Amino acid sequence: MLFPVLHLPKAMKFSSFSLIASSLLSLVAAAPVTLLKRDSRWDYANDKIYGVNIGGWLVLEPFITPSLFEAVSSDVPVDEYHYTEALGKEEAEKRLQEHWSTWIKEEDFKGMANAGLNFVRIPIGYWAFQLAEGDPYVQGQQEYLDKALEWCAKYGLKAWVDLHGAPGSQNGFDNSGKRGEIGWQNTTGYVDLTVQVLDQLTSKYGGSNYSDVIIGIELLNEPLGSYLDFDQLVDFYNKGYQLVRNNGNAPVIIHDAYLPDHTFDNVLNTEQDPNVWEVIVDHHHYQVFDEGSLSQSIDEHVSTACGWGQSENTEYHYSLCGEWTAALTDCAKWLNGAGRGARYDATFGGGNYIGSCDQLYTANYDYFTPEVISNYRRYVEAQMDSFLYGKNAGWVFWCWKTENTIEWDMQRLLGLGIIPQPLDDRQYPNQCGFS
């Protein structure tokens, strides 16, 4: 998820909770260029992805599980790097093993399938495969990734394995493992280590052993293109592509680096190099990380969302929205980083006051009146329609569950009727004018 920090271009009532919990329990129970395709695991030209991210599990994020970070000390660590550094390896491993084994379980995958989803994006950090010198991180995540893929197979879900964090940080966001400096390209050692990790990752997960489940390897999540050397990034993508091909036939996913649409049309282009095939561009879309977006009316939010799909439909590569949200504010606790407030109420970023965050800081169902639910539902439907338009390959919501938020929590949003059931149900059809 995008956390544009450092000026970079990312108590409920019992009766309400019971109603939502009951809904959730019943849900869980119940002009395109023709690109050469050499693997039958997924047809990006015709099949559509309806997916969800498993955030805050194998890569920690303070806004998803704030209790983990608050339990360390009064001096709350801001990311997984500082979390493990503060606890030391032995205690960090003990706590993370408990988190990994309880935060996501088999029943979650059953719930995803029952909700009509067909896909899961699973973030994992480089440190699950190799450590850089001096890293405080602990390992053990691969065991749980393996379990997740087994559960995907059991419930008919496809998956991407997403390298979410690189040494030195590719974006400075806490979800890269280390908040602050964007140091990934500062030394060739960091990039080289990332390439080595990709080799390990693709040799294990990119071959035939997982071809019934894995329909993509994402080379790197959200490299921040405006702060990185573009030529070096393209070189990394080329190397990563070749590693995937050396180890198997999995589709290769490259992130758009938050650069304009069409930036990567001539990167890994089949028409320029017939040996290149099955490359997908991953776009992430949010309207909550700048004051201008937060100030928009619901009609403006819908119009912006519709424009995404129209533009990306004309890109050379097939594209997919690998992260999006129902959120119309940045009010969720620590969304902008541990210890930080929100732009919406002017407690972060130094901008103008837009509105109160009092009822959105944590999961307060009283805020979600019929009118509020209607606005959120309109926005969600517009995004879904946009990301499914034309050759756009689908969408992956961020994220499946959180401790304390509603705007970012698919399970709670399903219970409120903000995310449609079935997923193609429309209360506000054809908002984008595509038909």
UniProtKB/Swiss-Prot annotation:
Belongs to the glycosyl hydrolase 5 (cellulase A) family. One of its GO terms (cellular component) is extracellular region. Beta-glucanases participate in the metabolism of beta-glucan, the main structural component of the cell wall. It could also function biosynthetically as a transglycosylase. Pfam families: Cellulase. This is Glucan 1,3-beta-glucosidase. The active site is at E222, E323. SUPFAM superfamilies: (Trans)glycosidases (SSF51445). InterPro entries: Glyco_hydro_5, Glyco_hydro_5_CS, Glycoside_hydrolase_SF, Glycosyl_hydrolase_5. GO terms for molecular function: glucan exo-1,3-beta-glucosidase activity. Keywords: Cell wall biogenesis/degradation, Disulfide bond, Glycosidase, Hydrolase, Secreted, Signal, Zymogen. It catalyses: Successive hydrolysis of beta-D-glucose units from the non-reducing ends of (1->3)-beta-D-glucans, releasing alpha-glucose. One of its GO terms (biological process) is cell wall organization. Disulfide bonds join C306-C432, C331-C357. Residues 1-30 form the signal peptide. Its EC number is 3.2.1.58. It is an enzyme of class 3 (hydrolase). It comes from Pichia angusta (Yeast).
